[in-house]
């Protein structure tokens, strides 16, 4: 039985690490692996020892913590209906009508049920653990994190106004108009800046038998990075914004101010992503001399919330050649449209385009982790871990005991 357990753990730790897939599970035996210190000699870890004192019971470890999520499985968290837009134009010819009146009961939300195509999250931090009786760890990390996210434009409610009869991009009645189409055939991606992040957690050995250890852990992590670069690519509208700002709360309701997207826009907020994640895990390890492979399962929930900030397409504050954006003419020429006394110059161009950064959350909660810890002189250790199913991630931890 011992040989079978050794083989299974060693195969999982080495074989799965070749296909690296939020928070690491960690080695369940980690609290009891480093029993000697680089500065102070280790003491008995037995609470039943009559000679033991509280000074013997407590030790401190420090080191490096690196966690790299290459593909987190996320979905957008939105309502089934989307309100504030005008009716979708359906007529074959002419112009859109009633674009200043919202649909009575809203419309089906094109973002509902959408999945993220790619979600990456990288963290580098300092690690500090308080150990009790060589059985339990209370630890924290302090460092920096940054991310990258990509999805269909439908997942972020890219909308605009098409078919509106106007000769000027800053027509006096344009500020009262509402977007009437949602753009689904496009891609939205954004990068966050590198921002301060932290986490806290606890890990303990629940059961030990010979060289085998069964342990559990709990962690919570948080960070608030800002969007550094937003890139929107679609046929009707394409734009890139460095350090985007937008509208939150009541100010994000349609219609947006006519100055939205210009340098004169007011009441805008930074696009900050509020990242929160918690996790519980259970893992089994088996010590093979200096190598301690392990396998575990975790249950985690992560959210990335930007307060549904709405960001307008950048545009000029005054017209140049009757336009304020570089959006293309969708039919290539306005000569095929009714002239309407020259008011249909812009009716085939997407106007007042904007995008909403919707809340994202975990689509799969359960995951599997495999890894191994290499120990040197019971004072130093290096741990490598790979995670699968709910994310593809790799983790590295190097630490020493004082």
From Swiss-Prot:
Keyword terms of this UniProt record: Cell outer membrane, Cell shape, Disulfide bond, Ion transport, Membrane, Porin, Signal, Transmembrane, Transmembrane beta strand, Transport
Leader peptide range in chain numbering: 1-22
Predominant location: membrane
What is any one of the record's Gene Ontology cellular component terms?
A: cell outer membrane
- What's its membrane topology? Multi-pass membrane protein
What does the record give under GO molecular function?
porin activity; structural molecule activity
For whether the record's keyword set contains Membrane, the answer is: yes
Quote the Pfam families the UniProt record gives: Chlam_OMP
BP GO terms, sorted: monoatomic ion transport; regulation of cell shape
Please report which protein family the annotation says this sequence is part of.
Answer: Belongs to the chlamydial porin (CP) (TC 1.B.2) family.
Q: What does this gene product do?
A: In elementary bodies (EBs, the infectious stage, which is able to survive outside the host cell) provides the structural integrity of the outer envelope through disulfide cross-links with the small cysteine-rich protein and the large cysteine-rich periplasmic protein. It has been described in publications as the Sarkosyl-insoluble COMC (Chlamydia outer membrane complex), and serves as the functional equivalent of peptidoglycan. It is present but some of the disulfide bonds are reduced in reticulate bodies (RBs).
Q: Report what the protein is called.
A: Major outer membrane porin
């Amino acid at each position: 039985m011992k040989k079978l357990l050794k083989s299974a753990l060693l195969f999982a730790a080495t074989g799965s690490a070749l296909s690296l897939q939020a928070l690491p599970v960690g080695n369940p035996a980690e609290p009891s692996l480093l029993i000697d210190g680089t500065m102070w000699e280790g003491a008995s870890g037995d609470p039943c020892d009559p000679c033991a004192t509280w000074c013997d019971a407590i030790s401190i470890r420090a080191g490096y913590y690196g966690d790299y999520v290459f593909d987190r499985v996320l979905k957008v968290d939105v309502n089934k209906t989307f309100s504030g837009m005008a009716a979708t134009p359906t007529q074959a010819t002419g112009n859109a009508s009633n674009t200043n009146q919202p649909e009575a009961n809203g419309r089906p939300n094109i973002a509902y049920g959408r999945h993220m195509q790619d979600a990456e999250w990288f963290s580098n931090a300092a690690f500090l653990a308080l150990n009790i009786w060589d059985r339990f760890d209370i630890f924290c990390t302090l460092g920096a994190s940054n991310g990258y996210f990509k999805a269909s434009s439908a997942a972020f409610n890219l909308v605009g106004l098409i078919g509106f009869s106007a000769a000027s991009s800053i027509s006096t009645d344009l500020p009262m108009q509402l977007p009437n189409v949602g753009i689904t055939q496009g891609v939205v991606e954004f990068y966050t800046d590198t921002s301060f992040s932290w986490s806290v957690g606890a890990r303990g050995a629940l059961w030990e038998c010979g060289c085998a250890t069964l342990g559990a852990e709990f962690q919570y992590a948080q960070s608030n990075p800002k969007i550094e670069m937003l890139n929107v690519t679609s046929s009707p509208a394409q734009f890139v914004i460095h350090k985007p700002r937008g509208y939150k709360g009541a100010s994000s309701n349609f219609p947006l101010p006519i100055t939205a997207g210009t340098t004169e826009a007011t009441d805008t907020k930074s696009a900050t992503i509020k990242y929160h994640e918690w996790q519980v895990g259970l893992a089994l390890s088996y010590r093979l001399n200096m190598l301690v492979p392990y396998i575990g399962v975790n249950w985690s929930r992560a959210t990335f919330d930007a307060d549904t900030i709405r960001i307008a397409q950048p545009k000029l504050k005054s017209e140049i050649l009757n336009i304020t954006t570089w959006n293309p003419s969708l039919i290539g020429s306005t000569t095929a449209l009714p002239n309407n006394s020259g008011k249909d110059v812009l009716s085939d161009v997407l106007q007042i385009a904007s995008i909403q950064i919707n809340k994202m959350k975990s689509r799969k909660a359960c995951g599997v982790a495999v890894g191994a810890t290499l120990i040197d002189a019971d004072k130093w250790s290096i741990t490598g871990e790979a995670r699968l199913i709910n994310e593809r991630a790799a983790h590295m931890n190097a630490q020493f005991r004082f």
